């Protein structure tokens, strides 16, 4: 049976989620961050983490952005095949929600044309990823992405012979090269397989996973654990000033790939790993 959803309902939810994601970190991120404060061995690193923790608290209580870079809006939509949208197109509804959220929420407008650098003045357009699923609901994830860490992200088109050791080295290379520029402690999304664009999309989506969920089964889960340990042994530390907590998590997504390739994308996010989730 077809279920009708009004475009304005999508717009309203996107607006609220843009503001929410920029003011308050999800509970899983806050819990992992608190744990990092306890685990950090460096006195300077712990001091930095405590300052960042205080910043998170102030932002949530005063309803102000956690970071001055309120990001480019990345939206993941899982649209049930039994949904009919009435009152406008889905893309227009999403972008209107981003416009309303950033303008009415007084969030920084950071989106410009790529060459002439003219600002669009409302943080649109969003980057929208669509997936058709069963059912009559729309699953929405809003993930504002700041560009300090985005600029440190990498894609590696490895050879099949590079294997799992090549994947490990690719991730460690990206993190080493990022150093303090990604505002550590980081959350690291890794996409393995697919094509050039598929691995990048997976790496981005991996950042939205609830950090308190069970890790993936098989080699991906083991690789997450190993890479997190290796990354934290790099000693980059909070703020890039040294310490035992360089990353809060490594999240991996995989997809089958061509016999001739091994694409790997590493999407780095700073400690302000923002995402809001709703189902309508």
Where are these regions (language model features)?
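Non-transmembrane, aqueous-exposed alpha-helical and coiled segments at domain scale
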Residues: 1-190, 195-280
